[in-house]
């Protein structure tokens, strides 16, 4: 069976989902008929994801899924070095995917808004304005690589799609993200 390899922060890892099968990565792979190799790591930043692909290069895959940056902006706030590290990390990860499977599509999921960034110090420096800035960088960098598409979670509603912790998606949020990823992947795979 062909596989999808996913990388990123706790949302990719499945935090907030009621079960492993209800997380965005599992739902996306299932919807596309792909076997899942989920390498998401809760609490990771983009630099952590970049370090992971440097230490253990990605395997070949029919599709790569990436969602990263939320912890960078929550911890780094509007620090210029934080967004620069995010940019460099995206280049590292996307280049690693291209080396592993040059023709395989990559779906990078844009980060949706949260309700409250003031909780969970020291990860309390973010804002939805920074989400917009990081998503802008994601779109700009993705456009520099062949077969990389950005999935935009249409219909995202932070009021109903975040878990009680206000940081992670609940099952409805995971379904929304998976739907966006599946739509982007289906278009990219044609």
Language model regions located:
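A short helix->loop->beta-strand "cap" motif at the edges of active sites that frequently abuts
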Residues: 99-106
């Amino acid at each position: 069976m062909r596989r999808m390899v996913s990388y990123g922060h706790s949302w990719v890892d499945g935090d907030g989902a009621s079960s492993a099968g209800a997380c965005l990565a599992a739902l996306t792979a299932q919807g596309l008929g792909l076997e899942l190799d989920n390498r998401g790591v809760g609490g990771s930043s983009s630099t952590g994801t970049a370090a992971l692909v440097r230490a253990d290069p990605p395997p070949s895959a029919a599709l790569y899924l990436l969602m990263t940056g939320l912890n960078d902006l929550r911890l780094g706030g509007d620090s210029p070095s934080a967004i620069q590290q995010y940019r460099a990390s995206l280049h590292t990860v996307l280049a690693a995917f291209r080396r592993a499977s040059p023709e395989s599509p990559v779906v990078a999921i844009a980060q949706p808004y949260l309700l409250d960034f003031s909780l969970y110090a020291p990860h309390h420096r973010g804002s939805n304005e920074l989400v917009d800035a990081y998503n802008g960088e994601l779109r700009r960098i993705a456009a520099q690589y062949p077969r990389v598409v950005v999935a935009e979670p249409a219909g995202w509603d932070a009021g109903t799609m975040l878990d009680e912790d206000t940081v992670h998606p609940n099952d409805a949020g995971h379904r929304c993200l998976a739907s966006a990823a599946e739509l982007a992947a289906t278009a990219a795979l044609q």
